[in-house]
Amino acid sequence: NTKLEGNIINADSASIGSDIKIEDGAKVEGGLVNQGNGSISGSVQVSGGSSIDSITNTGNGAISGSITVDKDSKLDSITNTSTSDTGISGSITNNSDNKLEISNSGNIGGKIESTGSADMVISNSNGGTISGGISSSGSGNTSISNSQGSTINNGITVSGSAQVEISNQGSVGKDENGNTVTNNGSGSVGIKDWVVSTDKDTGKLDTVVVGGSGKDNVKVENITVDQSNVDLDELDNINHIISGVNQ
């Protein structure tokens, strides 16, 4: 098995025009770092029982493909602080049984998805955007934190047996079915804290819509309404704040 100690660094204005594959039991005791104006045009794939400690996209770096970790392989963390419009343009998929921590303050163009038995921790902060939404279809537990000024588009979907905990002070968009949070699985979803925002032009609340066959297993602990510019009539009906859950 191949073993590499140290980081793989793509820096300045260097470009990697193909996929990066860590496979066949290879071990990278360090990380893949894309920094400066570095660009990686292909995908990053960790497969075949291989491992790498981390993937970092920083500076004005751009990764144009997706990041995939296959079953029995290992990636501990992904950090995206890139200020480029591209950021990481593809999806991030963890099929493994190894916990993955994702920290984003830049742009992730695709979906973040966990399909395996591993836990996943997602922190979206400092104006970060996750355009493709978040999906948990495996058995690993997922923790999602979306900070003020940050955005998750296309909703949060649970279709496995995992426990998912959500804390949201930012913006979470709706999926194609109009749901903010969907539970179609046998797992549970706990909304630990959620700030409901107000449309500054209309005064309407951005209602949290909970849907899916398992919506009865979505529990809300704390919900706060940002009342700046709110039409007070909106506050008369709890369904303007959150709908689809037992109240």
Give the predicted meaning of each segment:
Residues 1-247:
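Long, low-complexity, polar and repeat-rich extracellular regions
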